C-alpha cells in the first residue's frame, strides 16, 4: 500500500465571459464551489498551462471565443493506502468525479510519497515540462 499525490487535469467551459482572466476567475470559482459542495476542500485547484507552439513559452490555459471560455484546471489531491499507481488514479478520479460530473478528467502526474516526502514513481503525460 502506498501514498500518492495525484494531479488531474480538467477542461472547464464557462459562458458569458469577456476575457481570459474573467474566464479563469469564473472557472476556478465554479470548480471550487462544486468541490466544496461535496466537502472536498482538500483538493487544490490551480490553472493549467499550455506551451506556445511557436516560441515554446508557457501561458495560462484559458481561451475565449464569442464570450465562451475554455479553461484548463489542475486538481491536486493526496491518495492514501492505494494498492498501486492505477488504484491511486481510480480513487482520485472517483473522488473528484463525484463533484465534477460530466467533466472529463485525465491524469497529468502521479508521485508516490513516503513520510511526507515525494519520491519514486512519476508519470507525466505531457512531452514538454515547464
From Swiss-Prot:
Pfam families named among the record's database cross-references: DUF555 (PF04475)
Signal sequence range: none
Top-level taxon: Archaea
Protein family per UniProt: Belongs to the UPF0212 family.
NCBIfam families: PRK03922.1
Protein name: UPF0212 protein TSIB_1358
Organism: Thermococcus sibiricus (strain DSM 12597 / MM 739)
Amino acid at each position: 500500500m502506498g501514498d500518492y499525490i495525484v494531479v488531474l487535469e480538467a477542461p472547464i467551459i464557462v459562458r458569458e465571459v469577456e476575457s481570459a482572466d474573467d474566464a479563469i476567475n469564473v472557472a476556478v470559482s465554479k470548480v471550487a464551489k462544486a468541490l466544496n459542495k461535496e466537502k472536498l476542500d482538500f483538493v487544490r485547484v490551480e490553472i493549467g498551462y499550455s506551451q506556445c507552439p511557436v516560441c515554446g513559452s508557457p501561458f495560462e490555459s484559458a481561451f475565449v471565443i464569442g464570450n465562451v471560455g475554455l479553461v484548463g484546471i489542475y486538481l491536486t489531491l493526496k491518495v492514501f493506502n492505494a494498492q498501486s499507481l492505477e488504484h491511486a488514479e481510480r480513487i482520485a478520479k472517483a473522488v473528484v468525479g463525484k463533484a465534477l460530473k460530466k467533466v472529463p478528467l485525465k491524469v497529468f502526474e502521479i508521485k508516490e510519497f513516503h513520510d511526507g516526502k515525494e519520491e519514486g514513481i512519476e508519470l507525466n503525460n505531457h512531452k514538454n515540462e515547464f
